Amino acid sequence: MYRYLLFVLVAFFLAACGSSKINVVYPDYTKYKSNDFDLRVMKAYNYEYYKQYKEARDEFLSLYQDYNNTNFLENAFLLTLANNLDKQAELDNLAKPYLNQNDNLKRLSALYALNSNDINNAQKLMKELLTKKDSDPRNLELYGDILVKKNDLKNATKYYRSAYNQVQNEEILFKLIGIY
């Protein structure tokens, strides 16, 4: 009995090997449009991973322009500010229409204003963020930085303490100690 079963199994194996036609699972496969999108996003993140920040910023910026997604604008703006790249003013102008919709872009715009010594605009943007109920510690820390730049150390200490109470971060602690 097993001899016949083995014979049938070998016959199927040889028939499969001798077949000249190769069957494709999906013969009508076409390249998806999202494949290009995925490749471009991964390319931008690879540039960032390998510390090629200018190329990463440019790729995120072109993704934003092609797909009009503010997450790409956030990434481009963050890379530009964190690595002191060019086009900071251009990215700030691109972010302005979305400031009321996106807190991260508003925070980055305030950081740009602080870095370019436009302290009044930075303070105005941060006050708008601080009026929200969630009181993000990043907002408190950035507002403390603005107050330090204005030389209002007493109030800056208050905001740094509030931020440190929410997130025990050594960077905030160093800023708090630096005031004393």
Spans of features found by a protein language model:
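Sec-dependent bacterial lipoprotein signal peptides
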Residues: 1-17
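N-terminal leader/linker segments that initiate helical-solenoid repeat arrays
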Residues: 14-93, 98-104
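Residue-level recognition of tetratricopeptide repeat
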Residues: 45, 78, 111, 145, ...
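Alpha-helical repeat scaffolds
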Residues: 56-61, 86-99, 121-131, 155-164
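Canonical tetratricopeptide repeat
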Residues: 75-76, 108, 142, 175-176
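Alpha-helical adaptor scaffolds
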Residues: 81, 107-115
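Short coil/turn linking the two alpha-helices of tandem helical-hairpin repeats
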Residues: 84-86, 117, 151
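Solenoidal tandem-repeat scaffolds enriched in leucines and small polar residues
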Residues: 149-179
